[in-house]
């Protein structure tokens, strides 16, 4: 078994598990055992780009606010970009955030984030292990072109009750497990709930007590909840049943209510003469249930599963006002409601057999019915007692998808092994049928006892895309299914790598790769997303993308110290006929260089210290770097110096000039994370664990965007020579010390 230690950011190579490609990984907390055969697996496994995180590793990862996070652990891998710092984006080998498949005990989930992406939607206390694929996708997986994250729940305890309570800065969670019928039926359950709304309530009350004298009342609230349930029943030694339920939901409200507190000399809101309230409310989340039936055969396993999964998001923007509270006829409002949802009903049947460790067979059939509401938009107004409602009448779109696959893995000897598979998919939506074949293959050839060369190819299709108008991905971004106008997204990924074990307890992996992507979707330029008169298809345009790079990982273990260095090199391009005048442009997350350096020192059995440094080339954004003068333009994007006499009757203002899409690169992103783990034993015999960490220890303010300002140095003297432009970077995350405590019972 491989010994694995923890560091501030995990940098996994290509075999962190028995079915992955690197041997060891670095995490931040304590030494744990991970499924794997160590260096031997690094050389002999045919697959590439697979990483496995153990349950202990996931549960103990310290990140911002002391909350361990699966997705942020994956962000530290070479070839994986985080998007914006601190958020749970996953941009794998030039792909986008919607191109990642997340399976929770086989249940497909969408948009797996809380608090706008600060936390992922997975309660790590309920997780057993995670298998992550960024290349050589097995044929049993499909539907997303960039990565697969397959999350397995902890098995419940059939013999005794137990659990743990974890407390962090912003939330707490509880995990319990135990038998219902000892030895035959058992359950496990997890509950995680944020207490941001509870902690902020006293502060909000104090602020409103102060601002009500000025006729203002602030509206603010946020909470998220996760619930997980697993029920297992052993029918006999060969047959078992399993039911898993998942629920994760967020609610956010933000607004301001203004009222007249002076007209009547009162600070009581009910006594005011008028009010004007603006509010925004956002809710999003996933819920679902899956039932699995397992039947153990002589040489293999047969599994059948049925599931239901739904994701939805709702955004409401409202303004209510009344000029005279004594006169109901003066009440008016304007409201906008945007919604989108996906509901899946599916069934799976799979078979796996292992023949003497020489030949492994996997085969199966999947079916899914997808029900989409791509864009529900309702605008309503009440003016002068007359109500007006605008509805885009967006129809539900239903698709049926059937897939069949076969995976074959052969190990001829210690020198050669290969895996070959094929997946066939038929998707029918709105009268259009798409039939696609997806070949998958990988090969390993050993070069002596300590080196091997691997190569892989995978084609995969995606039948729904999420299109964003923002710099970060939001839960309100719409999921768009394929149609007669927009074909399925297709990716071809080519990989080749060298793997080796070196003297001095050192091992490495180097992978070169190229990815080709067709039928990407983006919003058209100059189109209003909230226009109810345009069908969602008319707002989009289709194009292509390609990316290529090299991923490198080197790890060495010396005594109590383990160190890992990872490096990723990436080029990421897009080309749309209707965007950027048809000229290719770099993608938002064209992060050229990425470095992770991690070290862990185990002082003794109770205390461990960790440090990790991360460097990433900055993201890209579209920014006007020039202005030009347009006489008579009254509302330009930004002013620019006019000719002599500007400011008199011949006023001239300027308009922003955009040279190209994603033309500016943000400054490089780097930070240092430090951590310490302390294990304790209580008098009652129960164990506990403190996790103390410092995120961004030297407080480097990494830029998330750039703002353009126009400044006149001389007040009330708008002379041409005094005007100049400035560009300011905006940052979000400073140094964040945090802690968490886990109590085991």
Set out the residue ranges of the language-model regions.
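Outer membrane beta-barrel strand-and-loop segments of large Gram-negative receptors
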Residues: 336, 340, 344-348, 392-398, ...
């Amino acid at each position: 078994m491989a010994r694995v230690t923890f560091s501030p950011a995990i940098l996994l190579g290509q075999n962190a598990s028995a079915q992955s490609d690197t041997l060891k990984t670095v995490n931040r907390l304590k030494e744990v055992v991970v499924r794997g055969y160590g260096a031997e697996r690094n050389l002999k496994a045919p697959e590439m780009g697979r990483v496995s995180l153990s349950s202990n590793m996931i549960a103990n990862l310290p990140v911002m606010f002391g909350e361990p996070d699966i997705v942020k652990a994956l962000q530290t891998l070479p070839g994986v970009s985080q998007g914006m710092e601190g958020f749970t984006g996953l941009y794998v080998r030039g792909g986008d955030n919607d191109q990642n498949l997340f399976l929770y005990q086989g249940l497909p989930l969408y948009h797996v984030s809380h608090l706008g992406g600060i936390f992922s939607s997975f309660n790590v206390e309920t997780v057993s292990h995670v298998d992550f694929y960024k290349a050589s996708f097995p044929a049993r997986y499909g539907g997303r072109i960039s990565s697969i994250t397959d999350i397995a729940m902890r098995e419940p305890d059939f013999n005794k009750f137990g659990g743990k309570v974890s407390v962090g800065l912003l939330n707490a969670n509880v995990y319990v497990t135990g038998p219902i019928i000892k030895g035959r039926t058992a359950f496990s359950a997890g509950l995680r709930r944020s207490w941001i709304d509870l902690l902020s309530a006293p502060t909000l009350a104090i602020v409103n007590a102060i601002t009500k004298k000025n006729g203002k009342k602030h509206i603010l609230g946020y909470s998220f909840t996760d619930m997980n349930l697993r029920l297992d029943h052993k029918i006999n030694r060969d047959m078992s049943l399993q039911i898993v339920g998942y629920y994760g939901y967020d609610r956010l409200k933000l607004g301001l209510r203004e009222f007249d507190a002076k007209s009547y000399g009162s600070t009581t809101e009910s006594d005011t003469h008028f009010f004007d309230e603006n509010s925004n409310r956002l809710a999003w989340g996933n819920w679902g249930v899956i039932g699995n039936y397992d039947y153990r055969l002589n040489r293999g396993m047969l599994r059948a599963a049925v599931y239901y999964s739904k994701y939805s998001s709702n955004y409401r923007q409202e303004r209510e006002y009344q000029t005279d509270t004594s006169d109901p006829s003066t009440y008016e409002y304007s409201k906008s409601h945007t919604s989108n949802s996906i509901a899946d009903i599916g069934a799976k049947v799979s078979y796996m057999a292992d023949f003497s460790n020489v030949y492994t067979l996997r085969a199966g059939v999947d079916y899914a019915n997808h029900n989409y509401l791509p864009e529900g938009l309702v605008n309503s107004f009440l003016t002068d007692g007359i109500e007006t409602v605008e509805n885009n009448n967006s129809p539900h779109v239903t698709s049926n998808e059937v897939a069949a696959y076969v995976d074959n893995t052969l190990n001829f000897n210690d020198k050669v092994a290969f895996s070959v598979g094929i997946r066939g998919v038929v998707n029918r939506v709105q009268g259009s049928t798409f039939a696609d074949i997806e070949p998958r293959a990988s090969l390993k050839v050993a070069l002596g006892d300590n080196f091997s060369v691997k190569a892989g190819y995978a084609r995969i299709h995606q039948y729904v895309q999420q299109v964003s108008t923002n710099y970060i991905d939001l839960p309100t971004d719409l999921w768009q299914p394929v149609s007669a106008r927009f074909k399925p997204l297709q990716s071809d990924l080519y990989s080749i790598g060298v793997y080796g074990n070196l003297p001095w307890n050192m091992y490495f992996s180097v992978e070169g790769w190229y990815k080709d992507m067709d039928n990407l979707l983006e919003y058209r330029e100059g189109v209003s997303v909230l226009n109810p008169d345009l069908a969602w298809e008319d707002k989009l345009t289709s194009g292509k993308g390609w990316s290529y790079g090299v991923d490198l990982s080197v790890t060495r273990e010396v005594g109590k110290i383990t160190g890992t260095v990872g490096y990723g090199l990436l080029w990421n391009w897009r080309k749309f006929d209707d965007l950027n005048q048809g000229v290719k442009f770099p993608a938002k997350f064209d992060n050229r260089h990425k470095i992770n350096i991690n070290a862990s020192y185990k002082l003794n059995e109770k205390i461990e210290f960790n440090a990790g440094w991360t460097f990433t080339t900055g993201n890209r954004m579209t920014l006007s770097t020039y202005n030009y003068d347009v006489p008579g333009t009254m509302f330009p994007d930004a002013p620019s110096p006019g000719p002599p006499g500007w400011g008199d009757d011949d006023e001239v203002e300027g308009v922003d000039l955009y040279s190209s899409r994603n033309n500016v690169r943000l400054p490089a992103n780097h930070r240092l994370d430090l951590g310490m783990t302390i294990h304790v034993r209580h008098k009652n015999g129960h164990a506990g664990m403190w996790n103390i960490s410092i995120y961004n220890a030297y407080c480097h303010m990494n830029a998330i965007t750039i703002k353009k300002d126009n400044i006149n140095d001389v007040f009330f003297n708008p002379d041409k020579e005094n005007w100049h432009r400035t560009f300011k970077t905006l940052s979000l995350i400073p140094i964040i010390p945090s802690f968490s405590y886990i109590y085991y019972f």
